[in-house]
Structures are given as structure tokens and as C-alpha cells.
């Protein structure tokens, strides 16, 4: 592809780690300005939601589970509203932290998934309040169970079941609260087959539809960033100078959704 064939450069301006965001923004600006191409910075979390809509959903609740972010989101009053979220650590970071302390290495999520065979379900903290969740106590308790002599298979199974049950519970509460009839999964943790199974069971029992993107679209990817930029510039979103500055704490509900 030639630069002359590119009509827009889109990059993630936040949320995220400052050095990573600035590196991406610098590269995007340099390329866009040198070839006189329009530039837009987009919200990483909203990009996960928008790419999920390509599965066929029209007005869903998004269960967004990644390393740093754990949120249940839905569109209301011209913004994607956060109806519930983690109040301590993201589910993915929690799983990675447990795996690291258990000597399993990084990334922890896929390794936990392979080991989580059960069959015994240990008593671990289940922390849900309304549509908010907390995972740090769960991870600490799981490590204590491992240190006390329980097998890694039993501990990872119990840890995974608890974490995903909490996530599916808040998703179901959001469906009930909003009256929406579609659920979309997003984020790297949504690659987990057990989570996909639990979300599918929950939505079937509730009588709503479940849309799960392919795994290469659940993890962070350039397609979702480009697609959201395309949606925004074709949906009467007015690009300002502020839109091209990185924002480490760029929350989902800070974005004006003009393209719906």
C-alpha cells in the first residue's frame, strides 16, 4: 500500500501507559504529517466495543475484560456508559500476577486456562457489589491455597471459575438494568474458552444473544483502532487539537459518540 492510498491515520491515545501511548502517537503523527494525511486519536476501550459490533450486535452490553481494564459498558445518552468495573485491579493483571507468583511465567492467563482442570472447587473470595468487582483478594487467597498444599490444577480451576462467574454476574445485571438483549465480549481475557462458554450459557438462560469476536479481534489489534477512527470521521465527529494528545486516563465514558 502507498501513502497516497491512505485516507486516515488512527492511533490509540488512551487509556494506557504513558511511554507506550507516546511512542504510538509520535509514530502516527510523523507518518500522517509527512504525507499530509488526516490524523485522529481514539479511545482504546471504545475500539474494543466497536470492533465487537461487527459480529452483528446493534445495541449490546459489552463485557470488557483485559489486563488493565474490567468494565461492563453500554450505550446511553450519546456515550458509552460504564455501569460497573473493577475497583482494584484488572482481571487480566490479576491472573498474570497470580501466575508470576506461582512460578508459571508470563503471560499467565493462557497458562492458567490450560491448567484449570479441577474438579474440586475451593472456597475463594467472591467480591461483587452491584455491578462492581474486586479481584485482588481473590488472587491473594488463591496463592494462599496453593502455598497450603492444594494442587495447581485445583487452585487455577477455582480461581478461574470465581473470576469469570463474577464477570458474568455483573454482565447479567447490566443486561437486566439496561433492558438490552445482546452481550458482546471484548478484551484479551475474552480469548479464554471457559469464559466464552460461561457467557454463552448465561445469555442462553436469559434469552438474549451473545456475540463473541474471533480471538485475533479480542486481543489488542490495529484493526479495531483503524475501524473506530473510520467510524468517527464518517460520523460527524469533529477532530480537535485535544484529540491528538495522549491521555493516560481516557475513560470510556469521556468519548462523545456521534457516529451512532
Question: Which residues fall in each region the model found?
Answer:
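Glycine-rich beta-strand-to-loop/alpha-helix junction loops that act as flexible
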Residues: 11-14, 31, 66, 183-192
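Conserved phosphate-binding/catalytic loops in two-lobed NTP-binding clefts
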Residues: 41-42, 183, 200-225
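Short glycine-aspartate micro-motif
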Residues: 8-10, 20, 60-64, 184
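A short helix-loop
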Residues: 58, 63-66, 71-150, 200-201, ...
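Short beta-strand-loop/turn "lid" adjacent to the catalytic site in phosphate-handling enzymes
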Residues: 1-29, 33
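A contiguous, well-structured pocket-lining segment that forms one wall/lid of small-molecule binding clefts
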Residues: 114-183, 189-206, 230-236, 251-260
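Conserved phosphate-binding catalytic cores of ATP/NTP-utilizing and phosphoryl-transfer enzymes
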Residues: 37-61, 228
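Glycine-rich phosphate-binding/hydrolytic loop that grips phosphoryl groups
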Residues: 213-257
